[in-house]
């Protein structure tokens, strides 16, 4: 009888009954209208049972069954990858299905370990999503569901909540606007790191963001993806004590910026302002079951703050807004602080082990950030951070990522492990790593990443290929299994994008530009990809990977050339310096020419998205300045006359190379040549050069050239083949 009831329920929820569900509409979007040959069935089950999906053939049709819309969407993606040879990734978020539709064959059933699959970092909203419109958001939400995401940080339009809150506290519209950051800097404003920078936003911005967020939220809820709203953590404007007479502490500075003030949890105003915040939030967007709060993020001064009282105040305010809500907090650097959260009730706090792919906090004894106490009995999520600032480069730790997850599951903290999370500072890079992380909870047993990679390549390229496999075997041995110790944060940086200097070891303050593998490795990988192009050049994923592999080979060659020119200058060898520096510059412009053929590596797309926010010239100018500034100087000059964050968000993009990075190097090489000729040194104010670039309004060109032919020509030009 139970089986019969389940069958009837499945039949009612099946597309075979004629109704198009949210998942069916998703399938239609991602398959460009060819998805009506897939039947979906949602079979609800008890919450105590694991999420699942199953694939099977029935009466000549492919059936995807699961316990929720997200589980079914995950199953659809599994079928697309491993049966249909269709890979949905950022370099191609829609693909038509093949005809005839390949059968499932041997039925597939997968169950998830853990009930949560989390997505996004505050920084992602600035480094990747700052200028997205609804069509781009719609495609991303489809990507989320296909990859099993059921819990997502959701901060779009939350500045309007604050705007309305400040008006209720007696601020004028102008004063409220001065507190809120500009479109590219909202992430750090939300995390209590800065106020006002990049703004003020125009009045119309706030209503527009509400409208956009309501569409986002509606789609998330339609697919059963839980939003994580920013909760109230105690942030207030620095001038609030003078404005309304409340007790605050000064958390100090963050990377040269004055942080917002922190409202004392001992002041009765904490509860009152928190309640007003949640009231305004609910007016616009309703309640959430999860709220994200990170007091004292990245070194905020806690002097004079009773951390235990602060944790209680934050939790109590959230529970007044929704008694069933869970506080989500980032496990990052020295947060969460023990005194803030250790005493809080279990299951009311969820800790994101944000950098578990390199420096896990969960208890791995090999980690430099291991906390032997784990998370004090609180629930937690195993996360992959991977990317910093949107800085490009092939990068990952496949073996560490896989083994770390299963080690965590089998550890003493495994009982509190709720699932996995993607927490990159930027997306639209290294698709293999994101795919790998998303599959971890659906694979019951520990597995060899090399075997997984073979399956991934078959799905991504639509066929097996010996040269492509050889290329990726090299990449697996190099950039996709980076060491965990002493290599900086994120991908190995390209010195083409660095502020000029000699003997450089990094391009950004916390980065690393020294390859951890021989530069011949990426060159040989590129050679294999070029050999495979004759067979695979119709696969969009292959074309992106080919361009990226040749890009990596050129970036690695640039490091070797930089070492040569540095040594030549040290020797005073004018001829050798001239030759090496000329090759370095020529390589940079060749890189620009290559990347102009691929949308994922072009500045033009980033600037176009910023300009598209409005037809109003002043608003367009503000958005473009935000877009350009974030990638270059990041912030204003500090007391040193510079900024520690310059080039933190460097991008090896066509348009940036040709209009800023290479002219910057050419200016520097001209100065060094002058010094070698015996002239007095002249200092170059690189900040001034970069700041002038942020005020430009020209559009970098796009190339209509064939990316495969260009990759081959550039490779031959640089490596003399």
How should these model regions be labeled?
Residues 2-7:
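Sec-dependent signal peptide recognition
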Residues 653-721:
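Extended, compositionally biased alpha-helical segments that mediate assembly or anchoring
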Residues 512-534, 547-570:
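C-terminal substrate/ligand-recognition segments
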Residues 35, 87, 91-101, 120-124, ...:
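Catalytic-core regions of glycoside hydrolase
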Residues 9-17:
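Hydrophobic h-region of N-terminal signal peptides that target proteins for export
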Residues 538-545, 549, 556, 563, ...:
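Surface-exposed, polar/charged faces of alpha-helical domains
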Residues 114-133, 144:
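Active-site-adjacent substrate/metal-binding segments within catalytic domains
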Residues 17-114:
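Contiguous, structured surface segment used for ligand recognition
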């Amino acid at each position: 009888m139970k089986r019969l009831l389940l069958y009837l329920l499945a039949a009612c929820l099946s597309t075979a009954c004629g109704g198009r569900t949210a998942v069916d509409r998703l399938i239609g979007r991602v398959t460009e209208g060819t998805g009506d040959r897939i039947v979906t069935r949602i079979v609800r089950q008890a919450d105590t049972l694991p999420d699942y999906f199953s694939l099977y053939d029935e009466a000549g049709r492919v059936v995807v069954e699961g316990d929720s819309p997200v589980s079914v969407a995950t199953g659809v993606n599994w079928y697309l990858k491993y049966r249909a040879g269709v890979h949905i990734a950022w370099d191609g978020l829609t693909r038509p299905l093949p005809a005839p539709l390949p059968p499932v064959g041997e039925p597939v059933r997968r169950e998830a370990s853990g009930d949560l699959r989390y997505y996004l970092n505050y920084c992602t909203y600035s480094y990747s999503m700052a200028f997205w419109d609804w069509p781009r958001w719609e495609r991303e939400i489809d990507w989320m569901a296909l990859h099993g995401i059921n819990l997502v940080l959701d901060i779009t339009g939350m500045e309007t909540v604050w705007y309305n809150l400040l008006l209720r506290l007696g601020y004028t519209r102008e004063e409220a606007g001065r507190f809120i950051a500009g479109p590219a800097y909202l992430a750090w404003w939300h995390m209590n790191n800065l106020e006002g920078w990049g703004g003020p936003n125009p009045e119309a911005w706030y209503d527009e963001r509400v409208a956009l967020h309501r569409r986002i939220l509606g789609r998330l809820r339609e697919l059963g993806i839980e939003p994580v709203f920013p909760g109230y953590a105690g942030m207030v404007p620095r001038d609030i004590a003078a404005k309304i007479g409340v007790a605050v502490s000064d958390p100090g500075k963050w990377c040269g910026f004055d942080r917002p003030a922190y409202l004392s949890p001992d002041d009765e105003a904490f509860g009152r302002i928190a309640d007003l915040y949640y009231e305004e939030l609910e007016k616009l967007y309703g309640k959430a079951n999860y709220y994200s709060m990170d007091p004292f993020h990245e070194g905020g001064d806690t002097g004079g703050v009773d951390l235990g009282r602060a944790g209680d105040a934050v939790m109590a305010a959230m529970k007044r807004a929704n008694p069933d809500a869970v506080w989500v907090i980032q496990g990052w650097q020295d947060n969460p602080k023990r005194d803030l959260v250790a005493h809080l009730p279990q299951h009311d706090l969820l800790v994101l082990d944000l950098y578990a792919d390199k420096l896990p906090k969960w208890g791995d004894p090999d980690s430099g950030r291991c906390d032997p106490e784990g998370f004090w009995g609180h629930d937690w999520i195993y996360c992959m951070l991977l990317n910093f600032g949107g800085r490009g480069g092939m990068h990952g730790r496949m073996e560490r990522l896989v083994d770390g997850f299963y080690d965590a599951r089998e550890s003493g903290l495994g009982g509190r492990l709720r699932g996995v999370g993607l927490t990159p500072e930027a997306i639209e890079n290294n698709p293999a790593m994101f795919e790998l992380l998303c599959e971890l909870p659906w694979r019951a047993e520990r597995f060899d990443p090399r075997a997984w990679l073979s399956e991934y390549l078959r799905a991504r390229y639509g066929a097996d290929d010996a040269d492509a496999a050889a290329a990726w075997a090299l990449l697996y041995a190099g950039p996709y299994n980076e060491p965990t110790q002493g290599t900086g944060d994120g991908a190995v940086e390209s010195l083409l994008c660095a502020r000029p200097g000699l003997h450089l070891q990094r391009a950004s303050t916390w980065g690393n530009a020294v390859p951890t593998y021989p530069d011949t490795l990426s060159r040989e990988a590129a050679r294999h990809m070029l050999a495979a192009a004759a067979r695979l050049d119709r696969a969009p994923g292959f074309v992106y990977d080919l361009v990226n592999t040749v890009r990596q080979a050129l970036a690695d060659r640039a490091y070797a050339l930089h070492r040569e020119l540095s040594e030549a200058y040290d020797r005073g060898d004018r001829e050798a310096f001239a030759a090496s520096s000329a090759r370095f510059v020529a390589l940079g412009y060749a890189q620009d020419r290559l990347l102009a053929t691929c949308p994922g590596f072009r500045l033009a797309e980033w600037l176009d998205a910023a300009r598209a926010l409005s037809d109003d010239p002043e608003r367009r100018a503000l958005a473009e300045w935000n877009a350009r500034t974030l990638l270059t100087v990041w912030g204003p000059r500090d007391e040193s006359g510079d900024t520690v964050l310059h080039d933190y968000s460097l991008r090896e993009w066509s348009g940036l190379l040709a209009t800023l990075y290479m002219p910057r190097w050419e200016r520097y090489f001209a100065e060094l040549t002058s010094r070698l000729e015996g002239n007095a040194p002249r200092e170059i104010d690189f900040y001034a050069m970069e700041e002038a670039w942020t005020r430009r309004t020209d559009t970098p060109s796009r190339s209509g050239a064939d990316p495969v032919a260009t990759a081959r020509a550039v490779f031959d030009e640089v490596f003399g083949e």
